[in-house]
Swiss-Prot record:
GO terms for biological process: DNA catabolic process. InterPro entries: Exonuc_VII_S (IPR003761), Exonuc_VII_ssu_sf (IPR037004). Bidirectionally degrades single-stranded DNA into large acid-insoluble oligonucleotides, which are then degraded further into small acid-soluble oligonucleotides. Its EC number is 3.1.11.6. It comes from Clostridium botulinum (strain Hall / ATCC 3502 / NCTC 13319 / Type A). The gene is xseB. Keywords: Cytoplasm, Exonuclease, Hydrolase, Nuclease. Transmembrane segments: none annotated. It is an enzyme of class 3 (hydrolase). The keyword Ubl conjugation does not apply. This is Exodeoxyribonuclease 7 small subunit. Signal peptide: none annotated.
C-alpha cells in the first residue's frame, strides 16, 4: 500500500503541536528527545517543500518574462 503524502499544512500543524508540548515542560526527557527528533524530521520535510515551491515559482517567473519579451 502506498503511503499518502502529507500536506504542508498538516506537517506544520504537527510541528507546532510538538513545539507547544515541549514548551509547556510537562513531558519527560525521553519524550522530549523523541519529540525533538520528530520535529527535526518535520522541519527538514517542510524546508524541502518550500524549496521545491520556490524553484517552481522561479521557473514560472522566468517563463512569464520570456513570454513578455517575445510578445
Amino acid at each position: 500500500m502506498e503511503k499518502k503524502k502529507e500536506s504542508f499544512e498538516n506537517m506544520l500543524e504537527k510541528l507546532e503541536t510538538i513545539v507547544d508540548s515541549m514548551d509547556n515542560g510537562e513531558i519527560t526527557l525521553e519524550d522530549s528527545m523523541k519529540s525533538y527528533e520528530e520535529g527535526i524530521k518535520l522541519c527538514n520535510k517542510l524546508y524541502k517543500v518550500l524549496k521545491d515551491a520556490e524553484g517552481k515559482i522561479k521557473i514560472l517567473e522566468n517563463n512569464k518574462e520570456e513570454d513578455f519579451e517575445n510578445s
